[in-house]
């Protein structure tokens, strides 16, 4: 597959004749949740069957959407105090037009390999001000269209980014944007008076600078570990029937608690990955699960909020405990850890992050985008509730959605299957020497104990 780039331009917001252009000197400080998130870019790819709107139509829709979501047309820089902030300078979002010399059917399914990185823009943040979002539209020989996004994670989480994608498609179709974007990053997360730090956040969301040394637990950025081990990604498809059987196992033996699809699938994957890695029994392993605070906080954060509202649950067990105990045990660990990240926990985090301790103790975010090998732990990004398949530029919904190639050993991404029947696709990156064992385990239901 050869991709030819024909143009690259900055698309700026178009406000219309009835709306006065706002100031381009405004600065939006990052919230405590933004600053605790990964300082990196995330790329995703949508694919649409023909007929697809012309590039000029997509560009015009993008300009209209950017007028409602100005942060995406801005830059990530610093404010007058030297703190990271979004600069609302209307510099524009990069819009790349490209063509492919093959039909889309000849390369689908798009496997999570380096080849897919040619379908979205690469970030260039070497300067003082970093681009926030980039888009690439690629036309295939058959008329199909791939739309690749690259967006900075410190600006928004998956839910907020998806809302912008929907806004772009709505603006392209000429319909009202919904949900209405909510840009206020200050008033939602004000600390309490007096503050109440009821939970420990050191060593959880924050770590000391001394712990930044990644020495041997790292990767060269190209899917190779410190001693040349190769990271490969396997896409696991869990059918609705398989997931139903996992849930049935949870209630076997008189268990009364019900578990979500996410909890069942993650528990199964956590056990399988631990077995595939061959960890010593006494080794502690944890799974980091992103928890959306929108509905958990009281009052709830509005669905149209444009920033990050995510913290992480981190259930932990020894490898021996995890693989010798029944699946219900892992599910219970996950269930209790996720339930713990409630309104009180989110507010405790806000109070701690604003207490001055982070600055006084020189703490930094534990979310480390440079950490490329997570073993003995895993991290899970669940996109199961994000409406990717509602994106419609006027010619129908996408028939394919995929994350880009991201060779971080142990970083799992869960997606709803495009079939819409309740099945789940999991992208699982592991060292190549662990993958055969993982494949032999992940499609087999655990035995009752």
UniProtKB/Swiss-Prot annotation:
Enzyme group, top EC level?
transferase
Q: In which tissues is it expressed?
A: Highly expressed in roots. Expressed at low levels in flowers.
Record InterPro entries: CAT-like_dom_sf, Plant_Fungal_Acyltransferase
Gene Ontology MF, one? hydroxycinnamoyltransferase activity
Keywords tagged on the record: Acyltransferase, Transferase
Q: Which superkingdom does the taxonomy of this entry point to? A: Eukaryota
One Pfam family linked to the record: Transferase
Enzyme Commission number, as recorded: 2.3.1.-
Q: List the disulfide bonds.
A: none
Active site annotated at which positions? Answer: 153 (proton acceptor), 392 (proton acceptor)
What is stated as this protein's family in its record? Belongs to the plant acyltransferase family.
- List the PANTHER family hit by this protein, alphabetically: AGMATINE HYDROXYCINNAMOYLTRANSFERASE 1, TRICHOTHECENE 3-O-ACETYLTRANSFERASE
Its biological function? Hydroxycinnamoyl transferase that catalyzes the transfer of an acyl from p-coumaryol-CoA to agmatine, to produce coumaroyl agmatine. Can use feruloyl-CoA, caffeoyl-CoA and sinapoyl-CoA as acyl donors. Seems to be able to transfer the acyl group from p-coumaroyl-CoA and feruloyl-CoA to the acyl acceptors putrescine and spermidine.
In Swiss-Prot or TrEMBL terms, this protein is called: Agmatine hydroxycinnamoyltransferase 1
Tell me the organism: Oryza sativa subsp. japonica
